[in-house]
Amino acid sequence: GNLMEDGSLLLQDGKIVALGADIEAPDGAETIDATGRWVTPGIIDNHSHLGVYPSPGVTAHGDGNEISAPVTAEVWSEHGVWPQDPGFTRAIAGGITSLQVLPGSANLFGGRGVILKNVPSRTVQGMKFPDAPYTLKMACGENPKRVYGYGGGRFPGGAPYSRMGNVAG
């Protein structure tokens, strides 16, 4: 968008309701002087592993990859999200207001991703973005080759050995 200097921004219930040069705040509104500062919209993290790979790492809550097979499209990252991951607090401090949490990249098809609002919640259901579609994670390259291919890895003799094998599935 365009740069606006000496403008005003009116928020109501966490949403922008007015933006411009001559906005009057309603009676009782809190005023914040942001002179010399930047105001930006919330950042959308389109590729996140927060909650499935906690930050800092906690082994008991690391649910990013289901490596029982190269294709695990049936698993859902929302079932592995740890809503109390301290990384969510750091992310909101950096401006990330919503994110797509994806499974890891070990598998060709790693499972469903989920769209979350970065809000404090005891459950992942309390963080889900209303009516957002589910997504599907695919990784075609080094990670699936490392985990399943080269005649070694976790599944000796397994595929894929190459990107061609990745695509062939």
Describe these PLM feature segments.
Residues 4-5, 72, 76, 82, ...:
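Generic, ordered loop/turn and secondary-structure boundary motif
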